[in-house]
Structure formats: C-alpha cells, structure tokens
C-alpha cells in the first residue's frame, strides 16, 4: 500500500493506494478545480474534521503541522497536535506494515464545546476508479443483516438541513460500526469504534461533469430544535474518534 498525507492541511489524506486492488488511489483529496461545475469549486479532503458553530468561523484541523513519526508494533505512526480556539486536538495516522489498511484517530481535548455540528471521518472516493453505474453504500441500521443501497446515479445529500434548527435530514445508524462504499468490483470498508464515539454516517453523492462526487461523512454532533437550548457540551473534553480504512474487492 501507499499513503500520501498533506502536512499543510493537518495530515489530510491526499491519496491512498492498495496495489492489490488497483494502481489508482481508492480515496483521497479532490483539489479545487477538479470539477468545472462552480457548485463544486472547493477542496474535498479525506480524513479531516469540521466544527461549525452558528454565527462563528469554522474550526478545522486543516492547518500546517510538523508531524512526528515512529514505528510501533509493526505500524508506522504519524502524529501531530493541532491547536484550535477550543483546545488542542491530537491526530494520529496508523499505517499497517503487513496488510493494506490504515487508521485515522482524532483525540479531542476541548473542556467546553458550543452547540453546533462536528463532522469528521470524511472519506472521498476517487471518481476515476469506481464504476459509476454500480456505485453503492452498505451498512447496518439496527438489524443483523447489512443493508445495501445502490445509488442508480441519483443525487443523495444526507446533510441537507431541514431548517435553521435541524442540521441534517438523514443519517445512517452504522450500528455494527461498519460502512462500505464502492462499486461492484471493489469497495472501501470504514470501521469505527462505536463504543468510544457513537457517530452517525451520512452519504453525499451527485453526478458532476460526466463524473460524480461520492463521499461518506461521520458526525459526532448535530443540531435540532431540542439541542439548540444547550449552550455548550463537555463530552469533547476527552473524546477519541477512531476509524480504519480497508480495501475490499472481487478477484
């Protein structure tokens, strides 16, 4: 495997390759200008977090860092501490030395966090690799059997706000801690430790410029008409969100 990180953007994943599945990257960053459509004129990173608080600037980990690295337990560990207005966030990338997989870990040390939305674990698929006609996502939503949802090239936006008080319209339970997304030949498996952080999953998909945009976003905090009465939360004073990415496919 090969993993390229962006030290100017808080160790965001520029690209991740699993050579057993493809010579092209499976996930990574789609830079500004990748799409001609002005509605998609942004950098679409993988592996970062975004905290949005009404009436305030966004807080992210997309800052320049000088990472430390070491070999521990047969894995490469790349780490950095990112200062924010709410407190430090420690970020670690763990790369397996034997099998093609890696982990992204965010450890939040925020004594108090205002009400808002905290989205992280962004995983952006490479639209030049996965076949558009057979794209799908799959997860458990409370049952014993995983549910598979073919996209059929229809737009999906689970993060579309319902109103000014309700920040997201749909979400995935991810009750087994696993989400898979890809096509009929190959897919990416994202595993999250739900016992440490009960995140929800959200899918974004749209056909764009004869290609498409397909991304999974995990959420650790959303807003609704009840949470708007909460001034701040202490749950992020010692919270770790950990996810592992593995490539899968049919031989």
State the predicted function of each range.
Residues 1, 10, 17-33, 52, ...:
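Beta-strand-rich recognition/accessory modules
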Residues 4-5:
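Amphipathic, interaction-prone secondary-structure segments
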Residues 32-51, 57-68, 92, 121-138, ...:
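Extended, charge-rich low-complexity regions and/or helical-solenoid scaffolds
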Residues 94-166:
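An exposed, glycine/acidic-rich loop-and-rim segment of catalytic or binding clefts
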């Amino acid at each position: 495997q090969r993993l390229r990180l962006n030290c100017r953007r808080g160790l965001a994943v520029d690209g991740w390759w699993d050579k057993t599945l493809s010579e092209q990257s499976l996930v990574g960053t789609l830079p500004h200008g990748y799409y001609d459509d002005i509605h998609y004129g942004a950098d679409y990173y993988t592996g970062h977090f975004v905290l949005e608080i009404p009436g305030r600037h966004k807080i992210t980990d997309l800052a320049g860092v000088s990472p430390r690295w070491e070999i521990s337990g047969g894995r490469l560990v790349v780490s950095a501490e990112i200062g924010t207005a709410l407190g430090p966030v420690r970020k670690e990338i763990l790369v397996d030395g034997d099998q093609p997989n890696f982990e992204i870990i965010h450890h939040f040390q925020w004594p108090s966090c205002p009400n808002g939305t905290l989205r992280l674990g962004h995983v952006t698929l490479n639209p030049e690799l996965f076949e558009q006609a057979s794209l799908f996502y799959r997860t458990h939503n409370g049952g014993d059997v995983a549910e598979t949802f073919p996209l059929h090239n229809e737009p999906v936006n689970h993060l579309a706000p319902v109103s000014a008080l309700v920040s997201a319209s749909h979400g995935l339970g991810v009750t087994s801690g696993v989400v898979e997304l890809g096509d009929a030949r190959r897919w990416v498996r994202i595993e999250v430790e739900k016992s440490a952080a009960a995140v929800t999953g959200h899918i974004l998909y749209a056909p764009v410029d004869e290609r498409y945009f397909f991304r999974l976003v995990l959420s650790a905090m959303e807003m609704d008409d009840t949470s708007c009465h909460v001034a701040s939360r202490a749950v992020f004073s010692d919270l770790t969100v950990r996810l592992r990415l593995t490539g899968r496919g049919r031989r």
